[in-house]
Amino acid sequence: MIIKNVSLETVCGITSKLPENIHLEVAFAGKSNVGKSSLINGLMNRKSLARTSAQPGKTQTINYYNVNDEIYFVDLPGYGYAQANENVKAQWGKMIEDYLHKSKQLKLVFLLIDIRHAPSENDRIMYDWIRRNGYDPIIIATKLDKINRSQIQKQIKLIRTTLQAGADTQIIPYSAQTKQGREEIYEILDGVLAAENPAQE
């Protein structure tokens, strides 16, 4: 995938109606502070279009990034922020559930998991939630640069086991620092686009 132009096109809050996009969508889900914004910026070759923050719970909206006028990167609210009150947590959860259930253009969901730790209960719930909505999530194991290379396969196995994910669930280690894993993600996105527009192959 060659990134030519990107823009933040639509921001949806709790009461907003989801846009009726004509281009396909790929969504990015993950707990607060897992590195969603860093991944999206890395994929778009931008430093700060998707705002990163050391403060968890920063993304409280569904943000649609138009990429090359052919695909949307959809940044879903981070979940599992402990300091958010229960009402806010419920609202975020409903936003994510509504999006997964109602989006007509959603083709693929990336679920981000911190490679340093076993998936949390919220991660397991989200993984099952995505699958129940008819999607086979691709796991992006973020913060790859925070562990030694010798630990990578052990941590990937831990993620797979904790999520009870089958061998068909793809797990891609990703580093926001070195961009390791980005080309694999680009190949997946190219495949999604090719499947949607076979005449362009």
Predicted features along the sequence, with ranges:
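Short, glycine/charged-enriched secondary-structure capping and boundary segments
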Residues: I22-H23, L43, E86-K89, R124-D128, ...
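Amphipathic alpha-helical transducer elements in NTP-driven molecular machines
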Residues: K89-G93, S120, R182
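Conserved G1/Walker A P-loop phosphate-binding module
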Residues: M1-Q83, A194, Q200-E201
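Conserved nucleotide-binding/hydrolysis micro-motifs of P-loop NTPases
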Residues: K58, I71, G78-Y81, R116-A118, ...
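Residue-level signal for inorganic ion chemistry
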Residues: Y65, T142, I185
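Conserved C-terminal guanine-recognition region of P-loop GTPase G domains, centered on the G4
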Residues: K94-T169
